[in-house]
Amino acid sequence: RDPDKLAGAAASLRAEFPQAEILALRCDVLDAQQVAQFADQVTAHFGGVDLLINNAGQGFVAHFDQTPREAWLHEAELKLFGVINPVQAFLPALERSTIASITCVNSLLALQPEEHMIATSAARAALLNMTLTLSKELVGKGIRVNSILLGMVESGQWRRRFDERSDKDQSWEQWTAAIAERRGIPMKRLGKPQEPAQALLFLASPLASFTTGAALDVSGGFNRHV
């Protein structure tokens, strides 16, 4: 959504992986026309598509009595059509691949809802349901469909909260460890961005060639469900 951040990320990747073929494009995943154009550009540039990773999301923090109708509708639209639009746009190219996969970045909220994020939890559960259904529908076309379920992962938002902390003597490691302990994360820390990325790489690649319809927990053991 932010062209400057996108350009910066692309520049960093090119510097780290000078031999890689990187195409950085911006589109609104809720705009089906933009997504279709994006899919055409990607397919034309690379000559085909083997994998699609859906990673559009945010959270609406509010209890039931503080959640307006607009928030319910937006959360449902973003979580569902943020996947539906890309899948519809890339499906023709994926059907031509011999190693095709679709992987959705979801949240542990899908199976473990929290009261203060009721709309987001419900939308995440709907996405997990749809992802499993897609895995059944697309397996006959040779397309695997899986998800990862994220717990608490280090991010820019957490860094901003750290900068605003009251105890300036706490290091980043101490501050995040305290959060993890309060929330009851068994591994006693937040996840690092590369950890869900590695899970995505596994599920999206032929390393997981016999896996479809799965939801891989990446939460440091924070899950409470069976």
Residue ranges and their predicted role:
Residues 112, 200-201, 212-226:
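Short C-terminal tail/terminal secondary-structure segment
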